[in-house]
Amino acid sequence: MESFENKGFLDIEEGIQWIKKNSENLSSSKKTILARLQQFHKLCSEVGLNQHSISSLLDVILSKKTHFDKNHVQLLIKCLYPNELISQTIAIRIISSLDPHGLRCSYAIQAKLLNWLIHVYEFLDGNNLLCRYYGVLFHFLDFLTLRPYISNLLVLLTKHYHVKSFRIHQLLALYQKPGNTADPYLLALILTYKQHFPDVIVGSYTYRKHGSVRLDSEWIAATKAILNRQSEDVPLETWSSEKRKRQSSLIPDLITMKNTSSSYSLEELTSVQQMGLVYEKIVFPSRIAAVLKSKLFLIFLFLKNKNVYYSRLDEWLHITLNYGLALRSGSNNQEEEVLHLLYKYLLFSPKFPKSLLQYVITFFSKPNITEENYNLLTLLVTHIPITTDSSYFNSLLKEFEQFILQKNAEFCSKHLNILWLWLFRMLNLRIASMGNNHTLLEKCLLITNHATFLVSHFSWDVSLAYQLSRLFQLYYKILTKIRKQIEPNIPPKELIYVLFFQPSAFYINSMVGLLLLTKNYQERLMDSRIDAISKFTHSYLKSLSEIILLKEKRAILSFLQLWEPFKSDYSQFLPIATRIANDHPYAQRVFSLTCAPQFFSYINGYQIYLQQTNPATGSIPLKPIQEETFGAFQSNLHLSDSWEDFQKNFIIYLKKKGYLAISDFLLSTLNR
């Protein structure tokens, strides 16, 4: 008989029939029964049980007449692997079986069933019906054997409307009883309640021991594998996302804790008058935080612009950021929710919360920082007031550096975009709101130095160098706007060579734009004694003269853009102009149809400029556009057969293309 039984069960139904039969009348020894149950457990771990099978096994587990001993029943509970979403009625049945006296079901079995319920909580088909039994579960908190499991279930189920005044009083009274002061399970529930009403549950509570039940990861993994096989169209990530969706929110709902006939909850408002009355009665910081969920209330808050509201909001933020977000391991999603809310708040808010300043620094000490939360935090940082102490700015940028140095160039590129946005916000500040100009310039200097350090760390990557040039362009625009005569931060020489030696005009033009801004800043201040800028611009011109003959027409165009603002620096331009103009094979190779006339028009204009300023100055030994270069242009344009017709048609062509200044200059030359 035993050799036949050792072959195992053909299917789940056969196993359940055998279990029911032997629970009423044992047909074998306990050792044989245990071996058969282990075979059944192995089968269940492979195929799982449907709701009907789970319900049938619960009949055996909860039966007072069963002949199975405690070990057999506990093994049966481990067999409850679901292969589909579990109905809430099964969970309600387990809660209904709880017996404070342990007569219907022993405390050990009740604890095992509650533990199973925690393990399958994310596989329930909902929790709306289960929430109706919240009070029943809360009643069993006083039972030491069941408390770890009851507390965990309550933490999972708790919503804002569950946190009532009487429950807060009962929970705190239970925690203060002798022997319960260090209870981690009660503390976990207290901290959950504190998230919803930090203004009611005051004081600090810290863990000595983590107050959660240890989950059997292998059992959960086996369950997920079964569910995945049973339902190919539902990926495993569905279960984890469902779990995250049920995670309690740190942001209170739009309700008041107590409502009377003369007051309204924020959800019940129907008129502006009612909204005004409710605002006047807002007392608790958590209610201020709840207001942030509604754009209408948020705008109303800014219109009221009362300091008492901002101070209460800051108080809620202090508790939420320093206590709520550190409550459990899954707090990254809660943190993302809070940071999203704060980002929307700061888009309109005239005031930056003080508690957020400290949290920004402590954020980087977290062991697991998600990229989404990091991006949100950096966006918040761009709203930090410029009146904030410079030492804080310096500390913040140091934290950024340590964090980014562990990443790659792509991550650094995203960070430089944030720095650009930060400087752009500073540029768009009204002059009156800029406060102390020296403070603003000090912040800009810190940001540009920080960006330069990061780009140099990543070996002057081309894309990063381009972003750095954009940062310096904003920096010089800010300097020009506030008209503050200072010795500015000069871009490093490495930036010159990295961008000028690129084959793309995109990078060269960014460098030219920066060079023009530095010159403009010098001219706006009307102070040529700023040696730093003079040295800076001359170093660029020297670099340009070194590489321009190695380039094609892109470098020539850059040269021409710089001609007019820097024509007084003839010592830098004269060698380049002479070389380009007299090297016709080179000119034919690099000149475009618009570049060549533009270049020669500037050369002629420069000669006129020299004659006017210093008549003793000789002319540049220059060969003008003549028939020698006509062949190269004619092959491109196919406009005329004669040099005279070519000149006329070429002027018409330039006008069509919008080069009016060049065409007018050439036309005046022809007329002469």
UniProtKB/Swiss-Prot annotation:
CDD domains on file: CTF3_NTD_HEAT (cd22647)
Gene Ontology annotations for the cellular component aspect, listed alphabetically: chromosome, centromeric core domain; chromosome, centromeric region; condensed chromosome, centromeric region; inner kinetochore; kinetochore; Mis6-Sim4 complex; nucleus
One Pfam family recorded for the sequence: CENP-I
Major localization class: nucleus
UniProt KW keywords: Cell cycle, Cell division, Centromere, Chromosome, Mitosis, Nucleus
Keyword Cell division attached: yes
GO terms classed as biological process: cell division; CENP-A containing chromatin assembly; mitotic sister chromatid segregation
Localization terms from the record: Nucleus; Chromosome, Centromere
Family: Belongs to the CENP-I/CTF3 family.
Subunit structure: Component of the inner kinetochore constitutive centromere-associated network (CCAN) (also known as central kinetochore Sim4 complex in fission yeast), which is composed of at least cnl2, cnp3, cnp20, fta1, fta2, fta3, fta4, fta6, fta7, mal2, mhf1, mhf2, mis6, mis15, mis17, sim4 and wip1. Interacts with cnp1, sim4, mis15 and mis17.
Function: Component of the kinetochore, a multiprotein complex that assembles on centromeric DNA and attaches chromosomes to spindle microtubules, mediating chromosome segregation and sister chromatid segregation during meiosis and mitosis. Component of the inner kinetochore constitutive centromere-associated network (CCAN), which serves as a structural platform for outer kinetochore assembly. Required for the localization of cnp1 to the centromere.
Name listed for the protein in its UniProt record: Inner kinetochore subunit mis6
Gene from which this protein is expressed: mis6
